Amino acid sequence: MALKHFNPTTPSTRGTVLIDRSELFKGKPVKQLTEGKNKSGGRNNHGRTTVRFRGGGHKQSYRYVDFKRRKFDVAATVERLEYDPNRTAFIALIKYEDGELAYILAPQRVKVGDRVISGAHTDVKPGNAMPLGAMPVGTIVHNIELKQGAGGKLARSAGTYAQLVGKDAGYAQVKLQSGELRLVRGECMATVGAVSNPDNMNQHMGKAGRSRWLGRRPHNRGVVMNPVDHPHGGGEGRTSGGRHPVTPWGVPTKGYKTRVNKKTDSLIIRRRKSGK
């Protein structure tokens, strides 16, 4: 889908660039596939802030999206494409031949009326799901499982994808967009194609209020706070912080590695590219 550029008729429309969602379904989601959703405001069960700068926003309902795609050898038709407030990608409502409805992540180049299917061996066509071991090398995939039957975990955000670059000894070699090359069991499911809405990264909100509608509150820098609030705070007049950048809790940031080693590190052939 394309981008919408606005004429600067008001200060808030100047420079605004939004996603054109005119082709998406405009009604309500399927009721049996949705659930009410309470807002946390970034607080945990003790009422303490665990994620800063969250709160408010439009009321949302959660859509149950099928990340497992384990209904094998039953074809489904794409009924409609929908907006989902819980993720950056669009979702597709599919109807199986036996009448069951489900939501899946909408891949690019899939439109209303297309047929998709999951199975041990299916056509390599956007929207079809199959084990990585059954796909030809070079296939572009998304919604990749890390454990068999656990549902897709990798490449689920708008416009993302991974590439199957090799197969060896029961494992598939998958190259992620970050540059990481890792091994995934060949029995793990993945969906062919890239995730929809690749222009999501090119949006420009245009005004603070649009971020507030999404539940994002203003993000404040540490150097403008008081010493009680942040290690960079305080000082007479404007200061540059006076120390190497740290988080509000004193942990070094901006390039400092915080990743904890784990058993599955042995499945990573090449690490993702450094941010520097």
Curated annotation (Swiss-Prot):
Keywords of the record, alphabetical order, are: Ribonucleoprotein, Ribosomal protein, RNA-binding, rRNA-binding
Please provide one cellular component term from the Gene Ontology annotations of this protein.
large ribosomal subunit
| InterPro entries from the UniProt entry | NA-bd_OB-fold, Rib_uL2_dom2, Ribosomal_uL2, Ribosomal_uL2_bac/org-type, Ribosomal_uL2_C, Ribosomal_uL2_CS, Ribosomal_uL2_dom3, Ribosomal_uL2_RNA-bd_dom
Family matches, as SUPFAM superfamilies:
Nucleic acid-binding proteins, Translation proteins SH3-like domain
| Secreted among keywords | no
Segments of this protein annotated with the region Disordered:
224-254
Q: Which GO terms describe its biological process?
A: cytoplasmic translation
**Pfam families this protein is in?**
Ribosomal_L2, Ribosomal_L2_C
Q: Which GO MF terms are attached to this record?
A: rRNA binding; structural constituent of ribosome; transferase activity
Q: How does it assemble?
A: Part of the 50S ribosomal subunit. Forms a bridge to the 30S subunit in the 70S ribosome.
Q: Which NCBIfam families match?
A: rplB_bact
Functional description taken from the UniProt entry: One of the primary rRNA binding proteins. Required for association of the 30S and 50S subunits to form the 70S ribosome, for tRNA binding and peptide bond formation. It has been suggested to have peptidyltransferase activity; this is somewhat controversial. Makes several contacts with the 16S rRNA in the 70S ribosome.
Q: Which family does it belong to?
A: Belongs to the universal ribosomal protein uL2 family.
Q: What is this protein called?
A: Large ribosomal subunit protein uL2
Q: Which organism is it from?
A: Gluconobacter oxydans (strain 621H)
